[in-house]
């Protein structure tokens, strides 16, 4: 479900350029079918991909101090859906509200419990 495979050890050569092409293909295929499509966690390529995707999904940007990287989506008037698992709401919600992220805390078991900002 992540669109940043090039940042991981894959066992075969996968470059940032390959990832850009793949991500754009996914966005094009979704749009051809009348679907909205979200970019999940590929923070490094957001500047190149914000025009191709309709929204962003992020896990743990507050924990890793990366939430500001999602700002191009907000500036383009596109939603950012964000979840934290270990960081308390009192820590990440002020950041999320300042950046205008739609944020919540979830448990890792991903049951029904949630605590939105």
Segments from the language model and where they lie:
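Glycan-processing catalytic domains of CAZymes
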Residues: 1-117
